């Protein structure tokens, strides 16, 4: 039996189980991020676990045809798989539900007609199917979004719970002991290559073989592209493949459609990007004015960067494209922390992924950055809402003199707090702005291995 690795979603599932007002749960996310494993592990909380996989159990699709009687459907499933389905004792798991649109439509009726039964559904490229449904139970279904493993989950997989606890006690000017800091930096470098796909992480913990992880990552990418062909009646699979791979060449950069492909129009690439976003494979980072909350009130979707699902998968795509340079690998493994942060677009991308995944998973999160165009472009890597205030976050190592965009933004928006994220140890400093009546700007230095602390500080 495959070893289960602790996931952040575990606590969300337990809370859902205990909620007397719970709705059927739809677990959403890209293929192979660990949805099925998380539900199967959660199923141990119940006396019975009734699993239906619509890719394997095609006959069960017929149970959902015609008039929907969910109690009768549950009885039929119970008889077919020979597992008791009893309210309060059984978890009913409908996996790969995108293969049975009728089952998606039926989820709402479990809330209306059989609310005491615990029901979870999961699927991949689910949003491609949902687009064709008139409704699938808005208000009667609870969604949770799942992603590849965060850096903290990666540490858990490597049995470094104690290291996490030590790290969590440091903040601001209370730095971490250098030995622990160095160890976390090395783990972070490893995470960039191994990524957060559970199969790759498990392979790393067993073998410490980067090549084995890369083979797994390449297989996952090819599986994604095979999935695209299932929807060729709705969208051109080659367009999705070209867009997905093209995005990876622009990690940490402002997205340019022409660099993705000269064979497709911008409108086609834009539609492919929308579908990849819905599928959880990419996340746009949209430019915003940063004038107030909410950040998307003045967002400009014509200017965006894109976060790819996982750093390991990103490098696998570059490998498949013949564009993964030895210099990049050497930079990740052996470059100085300052070089790695300031020269590697993948670092900026991973920082964005980390910040996004530590937010509530009940909705698809939006990410924002700021830019000011002129003779020279000023840019802030990320804008976040922290303690109900707009907070600029720079992914950068170096001196105060290299942070002109940050001082410009804080001066313009009258802000006093910011974060600088790098592979430096914890720390903070004050900057006296001579161009703004000696206003004091306070900058907290937060290591990239500690971005989960943004939730609680």
Label the predicted regions.
Residues 35:
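Conserved lysine of the Walker
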Residues 1-16:
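N-terminal pre-Walker A segment at the start of P-loop NTPase domains
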Residues 56-88:
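Short glycine-rich substrate-engagement loop in P-loop NTPases that contacts/grips substrate
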Residues 38, 42:
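Hydrophobic positions on the alpha1 helix immediately C-terminal to the Walker A/P-loop
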Residues 351, 355, 380-399, 418:
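Conserved catalytic cores of phosphodiester-cleaving nucleases, focusing on short active-site segments
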Residues 426-457:
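Domain-level recognition of nuclease-like catalytic cores that cleave nucleotide substrates
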Residues 201-378, 384:
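Accessory nucleic acid-recognition modules appended to NTPase machines
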Residues 131-249:
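Interdomain motor-coupling "hinge/lid" segment immediately C-terminal to the ATP-binding subdomain
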């Amino acid at each position: 039996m495959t070893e289960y690795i602790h996931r952040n979603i575990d606590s969300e599932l337990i809370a859902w189980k205990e909620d007397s007002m719970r709705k059927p749960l739809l677990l959403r996310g890209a293929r192979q991020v660990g949805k099925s494993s998380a539900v199967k592990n959660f199923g141990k909380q119940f006396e019975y676990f009734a699993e239906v996989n619509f890719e394997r159990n095609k006959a069960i699709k017929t149970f959902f045809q015609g008039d929907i009687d969910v109690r009768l459907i549950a009885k039929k499933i119970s008889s077919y798989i020979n597992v008791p389905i009893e309210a309060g004792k059984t978890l009913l798991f409908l996996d790969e539900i995108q293969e049975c649109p009728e089952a998606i439509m039926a989820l709402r009726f479990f809330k209306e007609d059989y609310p005491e039964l615990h029901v979870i559904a999961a699927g991949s490229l689910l949003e491609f199917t949902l687009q064709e449904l008139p409704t699938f139970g808005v208000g009667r279904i609870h969604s949770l979004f799942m992603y590849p493993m965060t850096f903290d989950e990666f540490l858990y997989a490597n049995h470094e719970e104690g290291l996490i606890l030590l790290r969590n006690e440091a903040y601001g000017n209370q730095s971490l002991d250098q030995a622990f800091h160095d160890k976390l930096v090395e783990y972070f470098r490893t995470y960039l290559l191994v990524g957060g796909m559970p199969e790759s992480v498990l392979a790393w913990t067993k073998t410490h073989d980067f090549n084995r992880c890369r083979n797994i990552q390449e297989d996952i990418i090819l599986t994604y592209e095979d999935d695209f062909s299932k929807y060729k009646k709705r969208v051109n699979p080659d367009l999705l493949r070209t867009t997905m791979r093209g995005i990876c060449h622009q990690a940490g950069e402002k997205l340019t459609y022409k660099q993705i492909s000269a064979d497709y129009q911008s409108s086609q690439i834009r539609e492919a990007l929308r579908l990849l976003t819905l599928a959880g494979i990419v996340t746009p980072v949209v430019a915003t004015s940063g004038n107030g909350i909410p950040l998307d009130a003045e967002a400009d979707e014509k200017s965006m960067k894109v976060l790819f699902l996982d750093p390991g998968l990103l490098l696998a795509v570059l490998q498949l494209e013949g564009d993964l340079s030895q210099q990049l690998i050497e930079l990740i493994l052996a470059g100085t922390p300052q070089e790695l942060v300031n020269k590697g677009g993948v670092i900026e991308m991973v920082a964005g992924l980390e910040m996004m995944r530590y937010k509530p998973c009940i909705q698809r999160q939006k990410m924002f950055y700021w830019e000011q165009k002129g003779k020279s472009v000023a840019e802030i890597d990320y804008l976040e809402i922290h303690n109900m205030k707009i907070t600029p976050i720079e992914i950068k190592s170096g001196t105060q003199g290299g942070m002109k965009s940050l001082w410009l933004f804080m001066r313009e928006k009258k802000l006093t707090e910011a974060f600088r994220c790098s592979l430096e140890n914890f720390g903070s400093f004050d900057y006296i702005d001579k161009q703004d009546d000696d206003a004091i700007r306070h900058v907290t230095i937060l290591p990239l291995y500690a971005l989960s602390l943004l939730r609680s500080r």
